[in-house]
Amino acid sequence: MGKRAAHIGLRALADLATPMAVRVAATLRVADHIAAGHRTAAEIASAAGAHADSLDRLLRHLVAVGLFTRDGQGVYGLTEFGEQLRDDHAAGKRKWLDMNSAVGRGDLGFVELAHSIRTGQPAYPVRYGTSFWEDLGSDPVLSASFDTLMSHHLELDYTGIAAKYDWAALGHVVDVGGGSGGLLSALLTAHEDLSGTVLDLQGPASAAHRRFLDTGLSGRAQVVVGSFFDPLPAGAGGYVLSAVLHDWDDLSAVAILRRCAEAAGSGGVVLVIEAVAGDEHAGTGMDLRMLTYFGGKERSLAELGELAAQAGLAVRAAHPISYVSIVEMTAL
């Protein structure tokens, strides 16, 4: 590769124009407006509440990268690639990029990544003046968007999670920080002899309650409003932490595991479900995202074992399932 080619390649790799243009288009729902028949820059701008000339410039760039088409009369259309920006597309990607959603907003914290690298602290408070969790706690709409996105993300693994482990043998499980109840619903549907509880804060707990009523699972599914930093309902066969620990620094992660260990006692099991660093699916980009959002991290099995030991637990087994693993822990 020549010097100029290498220079252009590095610039392209670091360029912010395209990622931000895509996110702005997602936030303004440009693809939906085009699909609805608004085809010129002026029409799309009117529907989206945008400045027509500026939007036209953004659209021209997204034509250049293959998301949209533009004919000689300035009429825009969607490419197959650009269809993914529609809100109703099966991939569900638009909401992740929408800068008004919890994740789209959180990703903008990458602008402050240097702070995280220098200090080891999350970048989110530097950008927004408050922590990610405090932000969600003060904004029900933002909180609901986070719960929806997380549920959609984990649904890809629900079938494998339900099939890969002998959940029925546990009798009753507590999904700690279980959000709107998607995982527990999948487990109860797959295992008719299993019952369970979702424990989470008021917003997601209310959503879980509605889900269980709607799906006819309320006879076997309970909801408890609470925090995983406080004592948990004791005596269940299993305590599930699905995509929880990577959101927290080591001290907080140990505190969460310790609460689970206390509730599980000598006869229960703690099941950590998340990507394990070192696996092919544990992305380095996601690891940086955990750092910038929360000061959290993607951990290796050895690192999870170290945290478990501090909480009075030991890793007994790990069951890989597509993009995540079920890491089984019991009392030392």
From Swiss-Prot:
Catalytic site: 246 (proton acceptor)
GO BP term (any one): antibiotic biosynthetic process
Annotated keywords: Antibiotic biosynthesis, Methyltransferase, S-adenosyl-L-methionine, Transferase
Record SUPFAM superfamilies: S-adenosyl-L-methionine-dependent methyltransferases (SSF53335), Winged helix' DNA-binding domain (SSF46785)
Residues where substrate binds: 11, 247
The keyword Protein biosynthesis is annotated on this UniProt entry: no
InterPro entries: COMT-like, O_MeTrfase_dom, Plant_O-MeTrfase_dimerisation, SAM-dependent_MTases_sf, WH-like_DNA-bd_sf, WH_DNA-bd_sf
Domain of life: Bacteria
Pathway membership: Antibiotic biosynthesis
Record note on pH: Optimum pH is 6.0.
Catalytic reaction(s) noted: 2,7-dihydroxy-5-methyl-1-naphthoate + S-adenosyl-L-methionine = 2-hydroxy-7-methoxy-5-methyl-1-naphthoate + S-adenosyl-L-homocysteine + H(+)
PROSITE patterns reported for this sequence: SAM_OMT_II
Catalytic EC class: transferase
Binding site for S-adenosyl-L-methionine: 133, 153, 175-179, 200, 227-228, 242-243
Record EC number: 2.1.1.303
Molecular function as annotated in GO: O-methyltransferase activity; protein dimerization activity
UniProt cross-references to PANTHER family, sorted A to Z: O-METHYLTRANSFERASE CICE, PUTATIVE (AFU_ORTHOLOGUE AFUA_4G14580)-RELATED
Family: Belongs to the class I-like SAM-binding methyltransferase superfamily. Cation-independent O-methyltransferase family.
Protein known as: 2,7-dihydroxy-5-methyl-1-naphthoate 7-O-methyltransferase
Organism of derivation: Streptomyces carzinostaticus
Lineage of producing organism: Bacteria, Bacillati, Actinomycetota, Actinomycetes, Kitasatosporales
